[in-house]
């Protein structure tokens, strides 16, 4: 594509819309990847009365919030709308939006919507209990989080919406549509519907046919970084952008986050430490796990896929521990003018590796086909206050998060034969220097920490720049813009110690799952349909 702007024209900027599970952000970057301003608002999903597990996405309210964020970002940046060279959107995966034949959005659900548990069970029984295997081999997804059971639920319970539905997109595509009036999906996000073929990077309508569902609702597929359209005059009045601003196809939050981290080549590996922790490994060609433990998603880089494992509620568990047990440390940290986690890490640094044998039981390694976890607990506590205290438990939680990540990376290596030589660690967890070092010691790999730790919006801005002709290549731009803060080198002796801790933890966790299986304890989380 011919350049619409030149890099020397430093007055131009890029806008990224980042639609997460709990909030929407509009982030403005300059052409060197520096964040200039942000507008942010929390949003809440709607539980439908008498529909257990439902979490609908409030289309009207959330579009208003998105527009407010765009206006706020422009105001905070102090720049005129005409200097936004392009805009793109990324979002949580799995959340879907349906439109009628006039193009009006009529229904949407967030990624956390779990209403279709019965439909998941029904679908698993299709084709002599082989349907889920067929979905996974083609798309890299199982049924629990896919769009297929949600569409079947609508067919069963909201036939009015199901009959009206003419098109399906993801939430990032909905934002782009509201700006431009153009409907399309990208492979990285649409891949999480369980309806997109990993090899062709296009829909596989036969899967809907096999499920007895309509296959006439599939949107055009366009690659991330493709020019979709321009901001309409109607949208411009609402959001503050200039009519005619290029709108570029975005993508899934994790894949665009990897772009923003420069994780764009085969075998490159990242651990993204947020509320959930994702362990992602770039694969040069589509391959799936014979054991169905790991999901496989299209990367935003054409032709490449990502094996992805997920640790559940890792960041949330740390926040729970801080808020439930560390009121004193929160007060001390406030007086010192530091973050509470920084103080807790300083305390935990005085605890020996292995945390005196304490084993946290929270997230299991990922088992995508039969995905559930044990009841939260700490195992192997002692009543010696010098050895078993807040500092010990905090370090044990950090060590356990690293152990689960290492288990997940090993699962990926088992089927892909990819053994990374280093890790990129990003997200909120990577702010912790002790946690970063523990991850290096547990994994046995050098861990690189980027300057920009929340890289999803940056990756989205890079896509916008490619679509506008500012950048020639997403991969090259991601590599050029990423900057590194520090590297943590593994300690071989600690790595050996953690190998033993990992083996013991896996054995204990299996026993804890047995308590859930016998109905004696309650799972931390269980996938719909189990």
Swiss-Prot record:
Pfam families: FGGY_C (PF02782), FGGY_N (PF00370). Signal peptide: none annotated. Disulfide bonds: none annotated. GO terms for cellular component: cytoplasm. It is found in: Cytoplasm. It is an enzyme of class 2 (transferase). Keywords: Cytoplasm, Kinase, Transferase. InterPro entries: AI-2_kinase, ATPase_NBD, Carb_kinase_FGGY, FGGY_C, FGGY_Carb_Kinase, FGGY_N. Its main location: cytoplasm. GO terms for biological process: carbohydrate metabolic process; quorum sensing; single-species biofilm formation. GO terms for molecular function: autoinducer-2 kinase activity. It catalyses: (S)-4,5-dihydroxypentane-2,3-dione + ATP = (2S)-2-hydroxy-3,4-dioxopentyl phosphate + ADP + H(+). PANTHER family: AUTOINDUCER-2 KINASE (PTHR43095:SF1), SUGAR KINASE (PTHR43095). Belongs to the FGGY kinase family. Catalyzes the phosphorylation of autoinducer-2 (AI-2) to phospho-AI-2, which subsequently inactivates the transcriptional regulator LsrR and leads to the transcription of the lsr operon. Phosphorylates the ring-open form of (S)-4,5-dihydroxypentane-2,3-dione (DPD), which is the precursor to all AI-2 signaling molecules, at the C5 position. Required for the regulation of the lsr operon and many other genes. This is Autoinducer-2 kinase. It comes from Escherichia coli (strain K12).
């Amino acid at each position: 594509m011919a350049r619409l702007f030149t890099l020397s024209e430093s007055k131009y900027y890029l806008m990224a819309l980042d639609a997460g599970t709990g909030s929407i952000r509009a982030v403005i970057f300059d052409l060197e990847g520096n964040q200039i301003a942000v507008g942010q608002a929390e949003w809440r999903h709607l539980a439908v009365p008498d529909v257990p597990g439902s979490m609908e996405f409030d289309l009207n309210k959330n579009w208003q919030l998105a527009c407010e964020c765009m206006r706020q970002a422009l105001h905070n940046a102090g720049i005129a709308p005409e200097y936004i060279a392009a805009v793109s959107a990324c979002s949580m995966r799995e959340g879907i939006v349906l439109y009628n034949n006039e193009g009006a959005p009529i229904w949407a659900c967030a990624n956390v919507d779990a209403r279709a548990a019965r439909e998941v069970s029904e679908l698993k029984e299709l084709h002599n209990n082989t349907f889920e295997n067929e979905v996974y081999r083609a798309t890299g997804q199982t049924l629990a989080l896919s769009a297929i059971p949600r569409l079947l639920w609508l067919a069963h319970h909201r036939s009015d919406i199901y009959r009206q539905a003419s098109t399906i997109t993801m939430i990032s595509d909905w934002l782009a549509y509201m700006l431009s009036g153009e409907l399309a999906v990208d492979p990285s996000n649409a891949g999480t519907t369980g309806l997109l073929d990993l090899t062709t990077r296009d829909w596989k309508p036969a899967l809907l046919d096999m499920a007895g569902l309509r296959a006439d609702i599939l949107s055009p597929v366009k690659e991330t970084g493709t020019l979709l359209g321009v901001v309409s005059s109607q949208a411009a009045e609402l959001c503050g952008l200039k009519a005619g601003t290029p709108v570029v196809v975005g993508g899934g939050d994790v894949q665009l986050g990897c772009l923003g981290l420069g994780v764009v080549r085969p075998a490159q590996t990242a651990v993204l430490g947020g509320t959930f922790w994702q362990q992602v490994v770039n694969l040069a060609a589509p391959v799936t796990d014979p054991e169905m433990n790991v999901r496989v998603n299209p990367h935003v880089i054409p032709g490449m896929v990502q094996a992805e494992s997920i640790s559940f509620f890792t960041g949330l568990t740390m926040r729970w521990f801080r808020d439930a047990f560390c009121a004193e440390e929160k007060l001390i940290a406030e007086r010192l003018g530091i973050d509470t986690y920084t103080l807790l890490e300083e305390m935990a640094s005085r605890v020996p590796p292995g945390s005196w044998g304490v084993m946290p039981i929270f997230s299991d390694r990922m088992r995508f086909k039969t995905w559930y976890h044990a009841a939260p607990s700490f195992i192997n506590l002692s009543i010696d206050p010098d050895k078993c205290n807040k500092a010990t438990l905090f370090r044990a939680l950090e060590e356990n998060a690293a152990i689960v990540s290492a288990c997940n990376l090993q699962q990926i290596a088992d089927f892909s034969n990819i053994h990374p030589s280093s890790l990129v660690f990003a997200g909120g967890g990577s702010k912790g220097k002790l946690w970063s070092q523990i991850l290096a010691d547990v994994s046995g790999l050098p861990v690189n920490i980027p300057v920009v730790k929340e890289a999803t919006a940056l990756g989205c801005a890079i896509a916008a720049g490619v679509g506008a002709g500012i950048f020639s290549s997403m991969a090259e731009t991601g590599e050029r813009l990423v900057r590194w803060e520090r590297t943590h080198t593994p300690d071989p002796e600690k790595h050996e110690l953690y190998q033993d801790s990992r083996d013991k933890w896996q054995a204990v966790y299996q026993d804890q799952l047995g308590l859930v299986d016998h109905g004696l304890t309650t799972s931390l989380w269980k996938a719909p349909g189990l």
